[in-house]
C-alpha cells in the first residue's frame, strides 16, 4: 500500500512489528513482550499523527491512489446494480458511472464520478474528470429516477470537469448549469456524498441534493490548492498554504453550513478498510433516509430551496447580509 509522507513513521513501525512477528514464527525465541510494547507505541503514534493532521495531509489522503471509488462503494452497499450508458446525444463518458440498484430492497438510482485504479484505467476514465456527455448521462438517469419515483444517491470524487477544447465545444458549462437547475427541482430525494475530492463545478454537477455529506478526509472546494496558489501567489508550490486558507475540509464545511454530516474514516483513511468505510456510509444513508421518510414532494423541493438559500448568509453583530 502506497504511503504518504506524513505517515512514514507509522508505516515504518508497522513494518518493524510485522518483521518481528515473522521472525518469531521462524525461530524458537519469544518476542511477544517486545511486540506488545511496539504495538502500544504504534497505537499512541497513530493517535498522535492521525489525530493532528493538517489540511494538506487530508488533501493527500483524499487523492490517495488506493482510495475507494464509486464502484467500490456500489459493490459493498447495493445489490442488483445495472449500469446505464450514454447521454443519448453524443456518447458515453466513463468518468461518470450510473445506473439502477437496490438499497435494502428499495429501488434507487446511483450516480458517481469514477477515476481509475491504474494508468490504463485512469486514461479510459479521464482521471475522473467528466466531459459534457457525462453530466448529461447523469441528468438522464436523474430524470428517469424522478419518473419512476426512485431516490438518487450521488458519489462525488473529481478534481473538476474536464477543461479541454472538445469538452468546451460540446457545452461543458451548459451541461453543468443544466444539472444544477434540474437537480434543484427534482421531486425525489437526492443524497450527495463527497468520497474523495470535490472539485469546483465538476463536483457541483452531481452535488445539489437534500443532504450533502462528506467523508472525514475528503475535500470540497472551488479550485485545487495548487490552482489557488498559482492564481494568488503565482506559485503552485504554495499549495499547502492555500489549502489551509481555503477551508476545504469536512470539518470546515460543516461549520460553514455547506454540508450536513461528516462520515468517519478509519485511521489513515478509507483505503485502510474499505468494508468498514462502506459500513460507515451505510449507517449515514440509513439515518438520512429515515429523515427523508414521509416528506411530500412539494415539501422536499421547498426544503431543498431553503437549504441552498441559507448558504452564504453570515451575520455581523445583529445584522444579516448576503454574500453575492
From Swiss-Prot:
EC number: 2.1.3.15
Coarse class of the protein's main subcellular location: cytoplasm
Cellular component aspect of the GO annotation: acetyl-CoA carboxylase complex
Protein location: Cytoplasm
Pathway, per record: Lipid metabolism; malonyl-CoA biosynthesis; malonyl-CoA from acetyl-CoA: step 1/1
Superkingdom in the source lineage: Bacteria
Keyword set includes ATP-binding: yes
Broad class of enzyme this protein falls into: transferase
UniProt keyword list: ATP-binding, Cytoplasm, Fatty acid biosynthesis, Fatty acid metabolism, Lipid biosynthesis, Lipid metabolism, Nucleotide-binding, Transferase
InterPro entries given in the database record: Acetyl_CoA_COase_a_su (IPR001095), ClpP/crotonase-like_dom_sf (IPR029045), COA_CT_C (IPR011763)
UniProt catalytic activity: N(6)-carboxybiotinyl-L-lysyl-[protein] + acetyl-CoA = N(6)-biotinyl-L-lysyl-[protein] + malonyl-CoA
Residue ranges of coiled coil: none
A GO molecular-function descriptor: ATP binding
Keyword Nucleotide-binding: yes
Biological process according to GO: fatty acid biosynthetic process; malonyl-CoA biosynthetic process
All residue ranges annotated as the CoA carboxyltransferase C-terminal domain in the record: 37-291
Quaternary structure (record): Acetyl-CoA carboxylase is a heterohexamer composed of biotin carboxyl carrier protein (AccB), biotin carboxylase (AccC) and two subunits each of ACCase subunit alpha (AccA) and ACCase subunit beta (AccD).
Family of this protein: Belongs to the AccA family.
Function (record text): Component of the acetyl coenzyme A carboxylase (ACC) complex. First, biotin carboxylase catalyzes the carboxylation of biotin on its carrier protein (BCCP) and then the CO(2) group is transferred by the carboxyltransferase to acetyl-CoA to form malonyl-CoA.
HAMAP family reported in the protein's UniProt record: AcetylCoA_CT_alpha (MF_00823)
Entry protein name: Acetyl-coenzyme A carboxylase carboxyl transferase subunit alpha
